[in-house]
Amino acid sequence: FSVFSNSYMAVIGAPLALKYARYSNDRAESFRIRTEILQDEKGGKTVRKYPLSKEAEAHVRHMAEAYEKLKDRYAGSRLDVNVCHLGEENGIPYAEFAFVAGRPLSELMDECLDRRDVEGFHKLFAEYLERVGYGEDVPVADFDLIFANILVDGDHWTLIDYEWTFDRPIETRALAFRAVYCYVLEDERRNALELDRILDRLGITENEARQYREQEMEFQKYVTGQKLSMGEIRNLLGGEVYKPT
């Protein structure tokens, strides 16, 4: 570090409670939030989500409502829903979640693919379908039930992020297709996945897969307010490396 930097910043005082912060500010005004991980003096951690605008306050409050509805839907299942409570700080509401132990399901799936354990991957996928599909006909569903939003700790699977919960039933196969679609897009190493086998398992035709992809594009427009997200901007710019002459 000393080789590349000729300056530094020293913070003097008690340890900061804030350990991590992420800004989701490439969204529509009504969905912009800040996510924080806080640690108390005893080492206990909590997660908080704050609105970044007055318009986003309703979105944050909706998270607590989503928790209650999803908790009821998955009562008796083998999928836990991370606890959420509403709080207020300087007149600004926030949603507070427990800090859950475990590893993202996506990491466990990656390990299967890295060691070419295809059957291990599909075993985890089958477990995902069984757990998230509980109460499929109930008129509430988390549209963003991707693998990275589930933490696995032994036999305990916990849904940790459910801000995109809607008051309508959504077919499990639609949620699963989106989870796989997002999973593959996030890392090119995952292109080795046998998508045809997954489509067959879900009973999804090529035409239906195309429709689901179009729905995903519409959802992203809904989230970003028709604006380009940072990920979309990066894709448009490309990754070319220019050598100076």
Stretch-by-stretch model annotation:
Residues 1-36:
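Rossmann-like AdoMet/SAM-dependent catalytic core
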Residues 23-71:
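ATP-binding glycine-rich loop module of kinase domains
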Residues 41-42, 90, 153-156:
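Short acidic-glycine loop/turn motifs at beta-strand connectors
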Residues 45-46, 93-95, 156-157:
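Hydrophobic residues embedded in beta-strands of well-ordered beta-sheets
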Residues 63-70, 124-128, 132:
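Structural preference for long, well-ordered alpha-helical segments in enzyme cores
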Residues 80-129:
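Conserved structural core of kinase catalytic domains
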Residues 137-191:
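Catalytic activation segment of kinase domains across protein kinase-like and atypical kinase folds
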Residues 168-245:
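Helical subdomain adjoining the active site within ATP-dependent kinase catalytic cores
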